[in-house]
Amino acid sequence: MSDWRLTENVLDQNIPETKPRESKTRLEEIQRLALFQEELDIIEELDDPVDVWYRCIEWLLETRFLGMETVNKMLDDAIQYLERCRFALNDVRHLLIQLAKIKQSYETPDELQQAAKQFYQLASKGIGLELALFYEEYGSLLIRMQRWKEASEVFHAAVSREARPLVRLLRNAAEFSRAYDLHNAHPSIHDAPYSSPFPPPRIVLGSKPVSSSTLPSKPKSFQVFSDASSSRDSQNASDLPQAKSLESEANTPNLPLLYDKSSGKRVEYSAFNFLALYENGEERSMEECRAQRYLSSIQPNTAASFPKVVPKNEISVHHDSSSSNVSPIYKNPVAEQSDTPTRSLPKNYAYVAKSTSPELKVFDTVMPVALSPKPAQKPPSPTIHTKAALADILDIFNQPLRSESLEKSSKSPISAQSSYLGTPLKNDENSSNSGATSLTGRSQEEHLDFIPSLTPSKNYPSKIYSPNKNLDFSHTASKAETYKNSNELENVKREQPFSELLPSTLQEETATGTTSTTFANAKRRPEDSNISPTNPKKLHTLPRSPQYSTVDSNSVLSPAMPKGYMFVNENQSMKHESSVSNPVATIPHENGKHDFGQLSPIEHKPFFPKNDDELPGPSGYLTMPYEEAMASLSNLPTLINPLDQSLRDLLFQVLRPSLLRDKDYHEHETSFALVEHIESFVSKIKPKAGGPGRRRSSNRHSLDGPEFHLFYPPNTNLSVISKLGQGAFAPVYLVKSKIETENGDVSQGGAENNESKLFALKIETPPSCFEFYLTRQAMTRLKGLRETNSILPVHQLHMFHDTSHLLMDYRPQGSILDLVNSMHNSTFSSSGMDEILVVFFSIEFLRIIEALHTHKIIHGDLKADNALLRLETVADSEWSPIYSPEGLYGWSFKGIYLIDFGRGIDLSLFEEKVKFIADWDTDLQDCIEMREGRPWTYQIDYHGLAAIIYTMLFGQYIETRIEVINGQRRQVLTQRMKRYWNQDLWHRLFDLLLNPTLHVSEENLPMTEELSKIRIEMEEWLVNHSTGGSGLKGLLKSIEKRKI
């Protein structure tokens, strides 16, 4: 009889054979075993301990120099541990470890019998009973032992239990069934001894055994008891039982039986809340519960605290726990006049207000009104005219109008605040004179204080920065009065208001204009949706990284303008009055659908004056003495929120004197009212085929098209061409301009000649000066260093009451994120850039971050879309293919631009002991200190840099996990490095950036020396590998030609 085995040897597929690797040494295997032992020491803290044992056993079976004693010991330890874990009973990795132990007994017949016993023990322990692998290997072993009946029972049990995977199990069971039918006629199958392959089921008390194996094959007959054949006379009388008197037992009184006499009526059932009987762990009688409920009906202040039972189809009656705060008009006059207890209402009754006077419509008297309960029905179908659908339609038509509901709510004695909070407020004279109360219960005086809404961590002090309430920011003194004591300014640049230049009708309309939304504490909000991938088939395109939004960009509304004032002659040129520096804009005529080839320019004055009392934050120029601001800044606590608006207002007062000395900083005593007009203009411009997005190069096609002209005093003419992108805080527009000073010279950072040059204009709402300040500070502190080439210059800042306008250089090559997405779209690959490119850009990032941190500047918002490509044109003869770390031979013209310093921090303004804490929603793009609510300083930039390098390497946003290594919590990457990468260098770099405080103490940050060492290693590697393959020069040249 031929031997039969499974066609699919699942065990051999899952358990690797012992194939020693020649490249290993005994020392390497011992070191690897020690690493596994470290993981096993902390296995109780891991989420998946089975994985550690499985990887360890799998590796041990491949070792060459470690003896079988070590392998067997680890197998026994693994089995002993996993058998105690209930979650590992049906884990396939646990079963594979058990099979690896059993496989050692697959040689001789005696060992096969021992292996069958081990399978029997696994079944008794419930290991692998839900896995098809267990039954397949068990049945294969029994067939090798010629135990076909037991094998058939094993496969039947597997199919009945629907072991997984079921499809493979059914296929193997069908194959076994065909082989069993062929051997069924052989007499040796029927003569072979039978023993159950599974242990008998446990018998529960009161249940009959089901398994036939527990019953004896031949039950014995009952034995009849008989006395021994001996003489009755020889028996001792004392051995016989004594006779008892039946008469004494009959006279014994029986025990009374307790039962309820039947009344002859139908059995009644009552419902009761038995939880009320055992309230607070004490048992109470039903009479006590009834009495307490009776007392609660006549004494509301002494109402019982146990839950109330609401019978079916009955509307519950709500009782207030206290009536001390209720106005007398809400009291029940019926209950006050009568001392008799209120009678309980029958079912289907509820309290309904009955009006006794025309002014009081609710809560006057309480009268019971019968309600007919509506049966619960399913939602009606919108296509079938059922009664329920008609009832819903009638309810819609019968509901009160919005104006009527508002009028009724105003007449109601319950105020809007009380209805919102759920309980009526006390309506007395004191409350009416104390000012309007907001929904949070704060008066108007309290809202004048700048109090941050930070919720500190429980492990850190709760004293977060909150300025002194005695500081007065409400006055709007002139600049001369503000700084007359400190002698800070001699000549203050301040444009004259143009309210007198506007028509009277326009002044009346702008007087009622809406103010911009105040800048609340920063909360994270995703960016605009127009940055999504343009091609739906290219699924690997990364979206823009999340931004931190604080206000709605649509909150600034422009007042209406008189039509008679806006239209002028088409050929009329812009004229400026000599007495005033008047900002003027020229926009296309928006009269329905018109052709952009025939535009009618409209000249008007877009900036409207506002009342300073209505202006939020620094945009209103709320000033305070310079000495007082510096004193408040020096008295800050050690833990502050860097984005708290009150702190930023204080910093603005400190920085304002130095900003006013800058000739490129301009403050306007007006509001900008053209944001909506600009948006309307750019929305009508049709982009090129390929879709919208933040593609800077795709906007060059509209240079010869229509323009939206703007004029900023004193002498800046801008022409809006198109929209570059939409951030969470501000839109960015492509503009062209010719910037000249009063003497006719080009302003700082401007064009080298009088021809038009392209710029980027960022209009931020609410206004902020910190991006302009930090960018200028970085350029000043790094002056003369090579790192200044990596900072995008800013040229002018115009501060209005509602917006700030930052003019900066325009770079059409795109950002690092655009480059990653472009490579995804061109190669349809999920990976990132070439490693040599990642090393080059990482060196540029490390160099600029080291320089900024050395000069106490934190960028605060490092991400892939805040770094622009800087690939300037260099002659091929002047550009060496070998990389130069010193920037020689044309390499100084290649690198990156850092942008968006708006969330940056100038540490020189704070004490050295000051640390920061995040008060916004965080994710994996933030450092672990921010996610865990711990203080941080430079860690935010280190994590941001790690996220950028991760995106360049893998083409994804960074994902990390926490591992305990050598007793220390470390952040590690979830992705594995490719085998041909320089893994050692990348692992050390990511470990340094993700775990900086494990390498340097928090007091010794920043760790510029450690980063400098790794940067030098990367530069040496890049010098040796810059000419391999396509070469670094060839890759950069292809990026320059690529349309990002």
Swiss-Prot record:
InterPro entries per the UniProt record, alphabetical: Bub1/Mad3, Kinase-like_dom_sf, Mad3/Bub1_I, Prot_kinase_dom
Query: What is known to happen upon mutating A78V?
Result: Defect in activating the spindle assembly checkpoint. No localization of bub1, bub3 or mad3 to the kinetochore
Q: What is this protein called?
A: Spindle assembly checkpoint serine/threonine-protein kinase bub1
Q: Sorted alphabetically, which CDD domains does this protein's record hold?
A: STKc_Bub1_BubR1
Biased composition, Polar residues: where in the chain? Answer: 223-239, 430-442, 544-555
Q: Does the keyword RNA-binding apply?
A: no
Q: Where is the active site?
A: D861 (proton acceptor)
Q: How does it assemble?
A: Part of the BUB1-BUB3 complex, composed of bub1 and bub3. Interacts with spc7 (when phosphorylated on MELT motifs); to recruit the bub1-bub3 complex to kinetochores. Interacts with mad3.
Q: Name one GO cellular component term.
A: old mitotic spindle pole body
Among SUPFAM superfamilies, the record links this protein to: Protein kinase-like (PK-like)
Query: Any phenotype upon disruption?
Result: Chromosome segregation defects. Sensitive to thiabendazole (TBZ). Simultaneous disruption of nucleoporin alm1 results in a growth defect.
Q: Which family does it belong to?
A: Belongs to the protein kinase superfamily. Ser/Thr protein kinase family. BUB1 subfamily.
Q: What is its main location?
A: nucleus
Name the top EC class. Answer: transferase
State any GO BP term from the record: meiotic sister chromatid cohesion, centromeric
The segment annotated Disordered runs over: 209-259, 317-343, 404-446, 484-555, 685-705
